[in-house]
Curated annotation (Swiss-Prot):
The chain crosses the membrane at residues 28-44. The gene is iliC. Its EC number is 1.-.-.-. The keyword Transport does not apply. Its cofactor is heme. Cytochrome P450 monooxygenase; part of the gene cluster that mediates the biosynthesis of ilicicolin H, a 4-hydroxy-2-pyridonealkaloid that has potent and broad antifungal activities by inhibiting the mitochondrial respiration chain. IliC catalyzes the ring expansion of the tetramate intermediate to the acyclic 2-pyridone intermediate that contains the trans bis-diene chain. The biosynthesis of ilicicolin H starts with formation of the tetramic acid by the hybrid PKS-NRPS synthetase iliA with the partnering trans-enoyl reductase iliB since iliA lacks a designated enoylreductase (ER) domain. It comes from Hypocrea jecorina (strain QM6a). Belongs to the cytochrome P450 family. This is Cytochrome P450 monooxygenase iliC. Keywords: Heme, Iron, Membrane, Metal-binding, Monooxygenase, Oxidoreductase, Transmembrane, Transmembrane helix. InterPro entries: Cyt_P450, Cyt_P450_CS, Cyt_P450_E_CYP52_ascomycetes, Cyt_P450_E_CYP52_fungi, Cyt_P450_sf. It catalyses: (3E,5S)-3-[(2E,4E,8S,10E,12Z)-1-hydroxy-4,8-dimethyltetradeca-2,4,10,12-tetraen-1-ylidene]-5-[(4-hydroxyphenyl)methyl]pyrrolidine-2,4-dione + reduced [NADPH--hemoprotein reductase] + O2 = 3-[(2E,4E,8S,10E,12Z)-4,8-dimethyltetradeca-2,4,10,12-tetraenoyl]-4-hydroxy-5-(4-hydroxyphenyl)-1,2-dihydropyridin-2-one + oxidized [NADPH--hemoprotein reductase] + 2 H2O.
Amino acid sequence: MVYSQLQALKRNYYLDWLRNLHKGKPKTFAITFMGVKQICTIEGENLKAIQATNFKDFGLEPMRRKTKGAMPFADKGISTTDGKNWEFARFLVKPFFYREVYASIDRVDPYVRKLFGLLPEEDGVTFDIQPLIQRWFLDLTSEFIFGKTMDSMTYPDRANITWTMLDVLRGGRLRIQMYKFLWAFNWNWWLKAVYEVHDFVNVHIRSTYKELAAREQRIRDGLPVGPERVDLLWYMATHVRDEEELRSQLCLVFVPNNDTTSIFISNCIWHLARDHEAWQKLRKEVLDYGDQPITFESLRSMPYLNGVLNETHRLTPNNIVQVRACLNDSVLPLGGGPDGKSPLYVNKGDLVSVTKTVMYRDPDIWGPDVDVFRPERFFGVRGNWNFLPFGGGPRRCPAQMMVQTESAYMLFQLAKRYSRLECRDPEPYTAVMRIGPSNINGVKIAFYK
């Protein structure tokens, strides 16, 4: 099984591999993976148990920190720890929850306008929009995290760190999954990428510490100081004064976060380009809105726009599998008994894996057209544990509202600007695994005004 999984990742059929793993089996079943019992499930109630009702019984640290799978890239951070260490890491990302950040259209708009300046001026020109969206998001997120944009849309070479971070993520995923064989996954290319990212982040950390020390000295001397920085690094640096610890905390936010929204928006466009009717419905909703000011609330009130976002999350979720280690003997509400409807006992040390890419295509939940892109299926649907793209409970993704706002605004402006969107790549979606699935051929399209 280890070999088949590695081959699936290497040859870019990992999503099919996961679906085949579940094919013909109950909705909750157990396997043995590298000598550890792993409970695989697509039951929303079981996801609720590990993320909310029995939250304290399940965690990440045994898989990610104690195994040293993420080292030397990072040690303590929001995605590697449990308990008090996790609570502190969660506290350090508090700026993600500031409404003035996640609800701000003014923060996003200048970057969207700049991206539009890079799109082909003539109608019908074939191009790949995915790398442009990656540069757009790098510029947007670097301002929020470091207080200064990288401006890779003006200087494309500055986006090279993005590809380095992708190497870190790809290697890190394998090392964490195959933690018992770390000696076989200590590649020079991965270590080189890790140290390049460290060098990049260290420059920002040291500059911030220097600026912070100068500010604190002026305050002690009774001298005036200017407005305080409001970026994430500044906030973190005021609470963590050890450079190595701060780098670990920051890397576990910056590196995974750098890939999420750009992949998601690219996937949205990939689906829309293959559905002329969906693009026209989205455009009609946008044009019907008129010239009113666009706000966080107005974006959230558009049913078709949000249906597009949710349907993209469903068909191509960024978080395809959520795995938790059982920290204390516990119980899942479903999976036991002959019919799988009774509680299931979980021993300390077992793993529970919720395969979202299979759950989100379960005909019992979504009907017979599970493989069809149909945003209307979300009209009037309230959130539930069968569909939580950003997770739930205390470990819900802190960037949820920010991702939704940035993505909705980008699609709104594209639909307003272009009357037609055409697919220029007939090949099916072939997922390369990064932080989430990304199409191997990019997103080749053409716009018409």
